[in-house]
A protein has these predicted regions:
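Short hydrophobic/aromatic beta-strand micro-patches
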Residues: 50, 152-154, 190-192
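PLP-dependent enzyme catalytic core of the Aspartate aminotransferase-like
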Residues: 25-26, 165-216
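Short amphipathic alpha-helical segments
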Residues: 45, 147-151, 185-188
């Protein structure tokens, strides 16, 4: 998810504010940008790997021993990426290149395509919070976390697994934070499948959930 922070306008190429990047803090990095995540590109699967020059040309004894030579970049491309994907179609490559070009030239505001997820998150959070839930990760360097594709919820007195199981009885599916490596109790909710007519349904069901699970 690239620049999906609607608290500020990150859609203007080469103008501040910018998308935060690990590239500001190290010379050794790989940026992985998904076509479907950045552009909501629904075609064939494609992504871009951006490797820093220093990391690309760096040699590692372990890679030399395993692959018989080469730098991180050459091993990553010719051994790892090729073995995992065998490349991708020409049509997807041309589509990705065209979208990147249009976005960089300011002709295509790709964030307009994903703003709906921010609005969905805002509405969903309001429903959950009103019925006794809390946001597990609610803070971003001192500011309220942005509304986007995902958000995290918890319920007092319930573990991640208990909450995930109980919400299934109310038609709500979410991923336990334990499976993501988190040490916090709660769930990761996704905004992608909610339909406009389902907000009222969710509100009604979470009201029943709260009634059946009074907070002590």
């Amino acid at each position: 998810y690239f620049a999906m922070d609607f608290r500020q306008d990150l859609s203007k190429p080469f103008q501040a504010p910018y998308q935060p990047s690990v590239a500001h803090y190290t010379d050794y990095y790989v940026l992985l940008i998904s076509g479907s995540k950045a552009f909501s590109y629904a075609g064939q699967r494609i992504g871009v790997s951006c490797i820093s020059d220093k990391l690309y040309h760096r040699a590692y004894p372990g890679l030399t021993q395993r692959y018989g030579g080469g730098t991180f970049g050459t091993v990553f491309i010719h051994r790892v990426l090729y073995a995992l994907s065998s490349g991708t179609s020409h049509s997807a490559q041309y589509a990705m290149a065209a979208m990147l070009k249009a976005a960089n030239e300011g002709q295509y505001n790709f964030l307009d395509e994903v703003k709906v997820y921010g609005e969905r998150a805002r509405r969903l959070k309001e429903i959950f919070l009103r019925h006794g839930f809390h946001l597990v990760y609610d803070n971003d360097l001192g500011d309220p976390v942005a509304d986007g594709f995902y958000f995290t919820i918890g319920y007092p007195g319930m573990s991640s697994g208990e909450l995930a199981r109980e919400l299934m009885y109310y038609g709500v599916s979410a991923i336990s934070l334990v499976t993501t490596g988190s040490h916090q109790e709660g769930l990761r909710a996704c905004t992608s499948f909610i339909q406009d007519h389902q907000y009222d349904q969710l509100d009604e069901r979470m009201a029943i959930f709260a009634e059946n699970h009074p907070i002590q």
